[in-house]
């Protein structure tokens, strides 16, 4: 009887251990998600979570990725600084679990190469394309304020990266605010000139977020996920030529475009959020509320994953 009881206990414990890893991990990424793309191509998540089936879903930007996360069709994703702020303001239940710091070089305000506009201040009254609720939204707001302008001083047209590129090339907008690799692609092909980037504007970086139900059910897996992302990032730093070639082939981009993007990236490691990250993100959220761009104040700290 004792042996039967012991076997039952061992079976239960084994079941709990197995439950610590999800049966499926659904990952949302963008063309800008270097670490995720490399992790996918090198099957790093499959190695880190051997009992887990990994599914990859590509998105054109952070806002649609957030929608998928909220709709229950995604577990984790990589986004810029503004999508999670908009998500919190909309009552979406997600958690920040890691950050990839940047230096503000991976996104820019672009104008046509032949444009007479030489400064952000000269965009007053002009039409500017960007994706609403994206990191480009933040870059442009801060760029305007630095130039002494207000949001109302320009005519912002909300467009996806692909539609923004088309409008930009057709002369339907005077400027386009976008992130890499779209930014590098427009500059490399000679159609765009950089009016300004995010340097000096205290960018918070890009974030890795998880749906709260997943975080609550599999908190032990988050550490392994962060380590895997950090490993993928190290590959991009330690093997840049190989990583550039792989990214170019995988995403269908010119190697010169990916090389430019890599040159804009920060070597800072992917890691759990620290007080400085939360503080930067909170100041950005407060700025968006003060400018009427989100409907209510948000508390960033409330959405930060707490490791068990």
Annotate each PLM feature.
Residues 1-6:
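Bacterial N-terminal signal peptides that target proteins for export
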Residues 14-16:
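N-terminal signal peptide c-region/cleavage motif recognized by signal peptidases
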Residues 21-150, 156-158, 174-178, 194, ...:
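Short, glycine-/small- and polar/acidic-enriched structural segments
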Residues 25, 125-130, 173, 213, ...:
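Second-shell loop/turn segments in exported
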Residues 42, 66, 70, 81-84, ...:
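Extracytoplasmic/secreted envelope proteins and their assembly/folding machinery
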Residues 82, 153-249:
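Pocket-lining segment of extracytoplasmic ligand-binding domains
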Residues 216-293:
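Secondary-structure end/capping motifs
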């Amino acid at each position: 009887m004792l042996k039967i009881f012991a076997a039952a206990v061992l079976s239960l414990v084994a079941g709990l251990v197995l439950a610590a890893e999800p049966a499926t991990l659904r990952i949302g990424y963008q063309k800008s998600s270097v670490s995720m793309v490399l992790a996918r191509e090198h099957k790093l998540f499959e190695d880190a979570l051997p009992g887990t089936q990994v599914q990859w879903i590509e998105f054109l930007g952070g806002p649609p990725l957030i929608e998928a996360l909220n709709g229950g069709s995604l577990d984790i994703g990589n986004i810029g600084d503004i999508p999670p702020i908009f998500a919190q303001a909309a009552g979406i239940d997600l958690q920040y679990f890691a950050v990839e710091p940047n230096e503000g070089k991976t996104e820019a305000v672009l104008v046509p190469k032949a444009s007479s506009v030489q400064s952000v201040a000269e965009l007053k009254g002009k039409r500017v394309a960007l994706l609403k609720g994206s990191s480009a939204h933040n870059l442009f707001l801060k760029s305007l304020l630095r130039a002494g302008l207000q949001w109302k001083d320009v005519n912002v047209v909300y467009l996806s990266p692909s539609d923004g590129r088309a409008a930009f090339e057709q002369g339907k907008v005077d400027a386009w605010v976008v992130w890499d690799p779209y930014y590098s692609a427009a500059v490399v092909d000679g159609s765009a000139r950089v009016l300004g980037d995010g340097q000096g504007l205290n960018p918070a970086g890009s974030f890795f977020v998880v749906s709260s139900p997943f975080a609550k059910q599999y908190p032990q897996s988050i550490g392994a996920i962060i380590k895997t992302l950090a490993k993928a990032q190290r590959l991009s730093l330690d093997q840049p030529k190989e990583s550039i070639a792989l990214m170019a082939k995988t995403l269908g981009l010119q190697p010169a475009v990916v090389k430019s993007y890599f040159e804009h990236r920060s070597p800072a490691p992917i890691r759990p959020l620290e007080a400085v990250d939360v503080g930067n993100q909170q100041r950005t959220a407060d700025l968006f509320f003060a400018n009427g761009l989100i409907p209510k104040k948000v508390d960033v700290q409330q959405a930060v994953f707490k490791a068990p």
